[in-house]
């Protein structure tokens, strides 16, 4: 990726340009110390003077009023705030009329920013004050006051907090009066510029110490640059939070959100005092010290999938290269390319007006449809369909171009959605809520309606990243997510009316990805690269989960690596320095998944015998139990040395009735409650009581015996035997109450038990054929 610089031969301003701001993706306003506000039209390459300000007004900062989200009519901003050296800020219309001038600070007003909703304005000045104003320019509050000038300010993503500079310090102050203020030393020199992105919640800072830094919202440094030759005078996030730009003297740099540099340009600009990204995130404008306005297009983005490599060579041209035969195709577009995604044998490209869908089998005839709103901010792909996110909503389309659905939820803000907060599978869409980060919304892909009974997926901590598995049946769909404590959890998407368990799968997990061909999960866990060959093991037999993992040392990937993709058996990891590392994992677990999904158990056993790996046998054991194939489970457990489980499986085979076998398989997986329910529904009350006795669940055993008026003496006898073994006296009041006047006769109890077993066997042989449903022999 690099920047394609365009700079006019002669500067359009006579003095330094202090600030720039985009109205649309093709129109820019610039303000200069020559008191002129100039409009630039990038389509016609024309400039026109909007207004000449009075000679005592030297503009310092400009910020356009945010356009209404999701309203088609208002496609561009209509007014802006301009801060100036005379201590005022001015509300100016698009045509250049000064609507209002407000005395704001003593000395220059160094920065002014609208919040994301456009309901409040924050200004900072040389007097060290931070002030909040209403939309119409009425003072609401003085948020802070200090002895040094405040050079830069930014709103938090939720518009509830403000970030501002204080010399070498950065301060995050909530608008609520008594809330905790976060303050930390960020640079060794005065901080000149800050920016806070609403999508990734990361902070940028630039200082006179010639460094730029990336921080999280808790003030922890994620990246610190090497010192440059000159102070860093400007930084700005791209709207989607994936890139940022850095400006200095004769320097413009394009960086990834993790800090490493994509491209460095040295235009003849003087210091770049202000950087603005276009609304679609494809181009940058810089306000230059020598009167120029520098424009830079982001080109040469690259997408890879299997043997295809797609490169954006120009604004409207892509090159497709097949690395197997070196065949090259050129794709020409009518408009500027904004976003693209290559996955699942399809390339999806959004331009400013249309969406193009190419198949990797045929690059010549794309499917084209018009977009409702031009600026697509996110494209996600699944095997059957893809998702487009723009300022107006979320839209699901098939690869044939057919519109499928558009999920909606209360308080939806599409401008802050990214690949970590939205996930797509063939049947489900998952979206993390921004208002309450502990909640995940789940939607049916085909209808866009909330999944099942509409109940939200709620977690105890804030969630940072979500991912749906890609294969298998809808009823088995799982979602994995990482919370703010870096714990990895997995849970079922379908709830079936019961409270589904959210189970912890790992700790200190920084990044995760599901395989696109089978349900294998990978992540970087602390200093280990970990692959969960069969994550569902946690629901079946968590004792053997460690045996189903593949682990290798991840220290070679340096700090904060990120998993880019997991295609087939190839995992691609982006290191902190920007380099890509490709890891190949064993292809056999994927083949095993394929055999099991087709119920080819004999082939699965044969494969495990051929591979001779413990992880394969452990996966097969868990898969067999999950699918109720106890014959295969017995072979697999024997292969991993779990002899106690082999014996238990043999004991299950000898049980007389189908229901008992089913209940004991459920118990094997730890589903005690479900096992008991199966037995009670089948009328096998004694067996339900007995499993509670075996588990020493004495309260429940007695409760069932009393409720069904049977085997109370059996429960009391086993309880007494248990107490005698440990030499203890009965203290439970309920047991003491029922034991009064009851004589325990073991002969009688054994006869009753024998009668129950005979009754179950007789009922099973008369009511059922010898074939056992749910248990394969």
Curated annotation (Swiss-Prot):
Intracellular or extracellular location(s): Cytoplasm; Cytoplasm, Cytoskeleton, Cilium basal body; Cytoplasm, Cytoskeleton, Cilium axoneme
GO CC terms: 9+0 non-motile cilium; centrosome; ciliary basal body; cilium; cytoplasm; intraciliary transport particle B
GO biological process: apoptotic process; articular cartilage development; bone development; bone mineralization involved in bone maturation; bone morphogenesis; canonical NF-kappaB signal transduction; cartilage development; cartilage homeostasis
Main location: cytoplasm
Entry keywords, A to Z: Cell projection, Cilium, Cytoplasm, Cytoskeleton, Repeat, WD repeat
Gene3D superfamilies in the record: 1.25.40.470, YVTN repeat-like/Quinoprotein amine dehydrogenase
WD repeats: 12-50, 104-143, 145-185, 186-225, 227-265, 267-306, 504-542
SUPFAM superfamilies: Quinoprotein alcohol dehydrogenase-like, WD40 repeat-like
A Pfam family: TPR_IFT80_172
Task of the protein: Component of the intraflagellar transport (IFT) complex B, which is essential for the development and maintenance of motile and sensory cilia.
Oligomer status and interactors: Component of the IFT complex B, at least composed of IFT20, IFT22, IFT25, IFT27, IFT46, IFT52, TRAF3IP1/IFT54, IFT57, IFT74, IFT80, IFT81, and IFT88. Interacts with IFT88. Interacts with IFT57 and IFT70B.
Protein name (Swiss-Prot/TrEMBL): Intraflagellar transport protein 80 homolog
Source organism: Mus musculus
């Amino acid at each position: 990726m690099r920047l394609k610089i365009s700079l006019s031969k002669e500067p359009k301003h006579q003095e330094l340009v202090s600030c720039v701001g985009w109205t649309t993706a093709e129109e820019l306003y610039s303000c200069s110390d020559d008191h002129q506000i100039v409009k630039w039209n990038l389509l016609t390459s024309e400039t026109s003077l909007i207004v000449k300000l009075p000679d005592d007004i030297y503009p310092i900062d400009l910020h356009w009023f945010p356009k209404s989200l999701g309203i088609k009519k208002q496609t561009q901003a209509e007014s802006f705030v301009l801060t100036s050296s005379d201590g005022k800020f001015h509300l100016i219309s698009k045509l250049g009329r000064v609507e209002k001038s407000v005395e704001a600070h003593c000395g220059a007003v160094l920065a002014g920013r609208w919040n994301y909703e456009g309901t409040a304005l924050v200004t900072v000045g040389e007097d060290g004050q931070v002030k909040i104003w209403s939309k119409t320019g009425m003072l609401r509050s003085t948020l802070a006051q200090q002895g040094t000038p405040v050079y830069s300010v930014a709103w938090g993503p939720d518009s509830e907090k403000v970030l501002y500079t204080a010399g070498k310090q950065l301060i995050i102050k909530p608008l609520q009066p008594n809330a905790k203020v976060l303050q930390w030393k960020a640079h060794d020199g005065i901080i000149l510029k800050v920016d806070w992105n609403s999508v990734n919640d990361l902070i940028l800072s630039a200082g006179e110490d010639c460094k730029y830094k990336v921080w999280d919202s808790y003030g922890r440094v994620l990246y610190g640059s090497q010192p440059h030759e000159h102070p860093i005078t400007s930084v700005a996030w791209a709207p989607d939070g994936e890139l940022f730009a850095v400006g200095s003297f004769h320097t413009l740099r394009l960086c990834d959100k993790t800090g490493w540099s994509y491209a460095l340009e040295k235009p003849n600009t003087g210091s770049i005092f202000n950087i603005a990204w276009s609304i679609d995130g494809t181009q940058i404008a810089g306000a230059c010290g020598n009167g120029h306005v520098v424009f830079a297009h982001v080109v040469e983005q690259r997408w890879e999938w299997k043997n295809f490599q797609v490169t954006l060579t120009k604004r409207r041209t892509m090159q497709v290269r097949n690395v197997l035969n070196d065949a090259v195709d050129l794709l020409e577009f009518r408009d500027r390319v904004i976003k693209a995604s290559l996955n699942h044998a399809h390339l999806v490209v959004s331009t400013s007006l249309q969406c193009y869908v190419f198949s990797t089998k045929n690059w010549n005839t794309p499917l084209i449809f018009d977009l409702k709103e031009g600026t697509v901010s996110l494209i996600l792909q699944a095997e059957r369909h893809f998702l487009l996110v723009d300022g107006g909503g979320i839209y699901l389309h098939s690869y044939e171009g057919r519109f499928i659905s558009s999920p909606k939820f209360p308080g939806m803000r599409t401008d802050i959605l990214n690949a970590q907060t939205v996930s797509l599978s063939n049947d489900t869409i998952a979206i993390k809520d921004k208002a309450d980060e502990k909640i995940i919304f789940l939607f049916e892909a085909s209808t866009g309606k909330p999944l099942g009974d509409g109940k939200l997926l709620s977690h105890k901590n804030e969630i940072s990243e979500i991912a749906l598995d890609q294969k298998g049946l809808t009823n088995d769909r799982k979602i994995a997510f990482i919370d703010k404590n870096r714990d990895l959890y997995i849970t079922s998407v379908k709830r079936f009316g019961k409270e589904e368990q959210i189970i912890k799968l790992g700790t200190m997990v920084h990044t995760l990805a599901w395989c696109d061909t089978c349900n294998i999960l990978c992540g970087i866990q602390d200093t280990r690269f970990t692959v969960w060959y069969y994550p569902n093991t946690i629901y079946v037999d968590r004792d053997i989960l460690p045996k189903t993992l593949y682990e290798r040392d991840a220290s070679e990937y340096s700090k904060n690596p990120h998993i880019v993709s997991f295609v087939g058996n190839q995992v691609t990891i982006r290191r902190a320095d920007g380099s890509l590392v490709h890891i190949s994992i064993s292809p056999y677990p994927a083949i095993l998944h394929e055999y099991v999904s087709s119920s080819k158990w004999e082939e699965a056993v044969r494969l495990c015998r051929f591979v001779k790996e413990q992880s394969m046998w452990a996966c097969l054991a868990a898969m067999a139990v999950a699918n109720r194939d106890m014959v295969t489970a017995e072979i697999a457990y024997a292969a991993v040395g779990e002899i106690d489980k082999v014996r238990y499986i043999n004991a299950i085979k000898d049980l007389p009735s189908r229901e008992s076998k089913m209940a004991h398989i459920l118990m094997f997986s730890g589903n005690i409650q479900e096992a008991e329910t199966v037995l009670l529904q089948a009328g096998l009350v004694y067996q339900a009581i007995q499993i509670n006795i075996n588990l020493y669940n004495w309260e429940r055993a007695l409760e069932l015996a009393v409720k069904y008026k049977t085997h109370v003496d059996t429960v009391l006898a086993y309880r007494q035997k248990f107490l005698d073994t440990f030499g203890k006296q009965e203290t439970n009041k309920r047991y003491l109450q029922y034991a009064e006047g009851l004589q325990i006769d073991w002969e009688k109890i054994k006869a009753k038990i024998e009668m129950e077993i005979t009754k179950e066997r007789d009922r099973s042989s008369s009511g059922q054929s010898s074939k056992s449903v749910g248990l394969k022999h």
